[in-house]
Amino acid sequence: MAQTKIITKENILKAGFLIIKEEGDNKLNARNLAKKLSCSTQPIYDSFKNMNVFHEELVNYVRKFYYGFVSENHNNEKSIYMKYIKNYIFFAKEFPNLFKFIFMENPYKETVEEQKFTSIIIKKISEAGGYSEDTAFKFFMQSFVFAHGIAVQIVSNYLDWQIDKIYLLLEENFESLKLYYREK
């Protein structure tokens, strides 16, 4: 008797992740998922009510990968905040399709998990700089918008700078904001 191949929800999410990473989310559909998994589309629809539900779960799956990535120290940065901002850019450079998927083409709003992650960063800024929470939030938003602009230019192939040059810009922006908020 032939052994039945079991396609799990996790297998399907991994396949979706790989399709986006390698080809972009415009190639993400049930047929391409089935092809990647070497099966029919039936296991996909057995695991997910529809492709919208799959897409929403895949966004969370990719976000978990992103959180793990930016939490690692890829750049030997001592400041948790600069580590995060630099890793955000590094993620965009290393995984442009995944970056686009979760930050540019994602119809789902910020999650509770993202809010917690951001709150931790803001708290660290507040503690390190001696800022109020409101000032730390402004500091975060100003530098994040700056970094996001650079990341978007990277993934859209508008900007092709070396990572060291980008990191220098981020550091200068960081120092400028520290000076600005110190004087307030």
Predicted regions and their residues:
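Basic, helix-initiating cap at the start of DNA-binding domains
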Residues: M1-E23, K27, R31-N32, V53
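Alpha-helical DNA-contacting segments of helix-turn-helix folds
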Residues: I20, V53-V62, F69, I102, ...
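HTH DNA-binding helix-turn interface
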Residues: K21-D25, S38, Y45-E56
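Amphipathic alpha-helical linker/stalk segments
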Residues: E56, N60-Y84, I121-E127
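Hydrophobic alpha-helical connector segments
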Residues: V70-N97, F140-S143
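Amphipathic C-terminal alpha-helical segment
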Residues: L98-F101, F144-I163, S176-K184
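Amphipathic alpha-helical packing segments from all-alpha helical-bundle domains
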Residues: N106-Q142, L168-L179
